[in-house]
C-alpha cells in the first residue's frame, strides 16, 4: 500500500519516492537504524550549507536533492520494517528544521540578505512546509488510516514497544516548544477543505522539500539563485494562499 493508501492523488514532492524505496529494500535487513538514516541526511544538509557558504552552489543544491531522497528513506524504512516511531518522526522534524536554518543562513551570508530577511525566509518556508504537512497527514489518515502523525500533537503519545517512553517524552516536549505553534496556526487558517483534499494536497505538495529542492537546483544551474526570495516569498506564498482560500470554499 502506498503512502496515501488507495487514494489517487498527485504528490509532486514524492518524485524521489521510487528511488527511496530501492534504497529501503537494500537497507531493510542491514544493521542500519532509521535514526542513523535521519542523522545522515542531517550531515548531508550541513555539508551542503557549508558548500553554499563557500560559493559552490551547484554541487550544494544537487546534494540537497540527494538529501530529499534520503529524507524519504527513513520513513519508508520504518514502514517496511513495520516499526513506526514517535521518536523518529519528532527527530526528523527537528533535523529538517536545523537543516533549513543552516542552508538559509548560508544563502543569506552568500547574498547579503541580512539577519531579519534571512529569518523571514526561514519562517516563510516553515509555514509552507507546515501547510503541506497538514494536508499530507489528513490525506494519509483518509487514504491508508495512518495515524502515526497527527494534526494536533499536544497529547503525548504512548511509546511503541521498540522505543523508550522517556525518549518519546523528551522529543515530544521539544516538538511542543518549537513546532506545535506552526501546526496550530495552519490549522486555524485552514478550512475544512474539499471532500477529497486532492486540490489542497497537490498544490501544497509543490511546497514540499522534494519539489522545492528541484526548483532551487534549477536556479543554481542557471545561476539565478538571487531569485530564490522571489520563489519563496512570491510564487510559494501565492500557492499557499490559494490552498488556504480553497480550503474555505
Ranges and model annotations:
Residues 22, 26, 72, 76, ...:
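Membrane-spanning helices that line or support transport/gating and their immediate boundary helices
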Residues 34-87, 103-104, 120-123:
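Membrane-embedded alpha-helical segments that form the functional core of polytopic membrane enzymes
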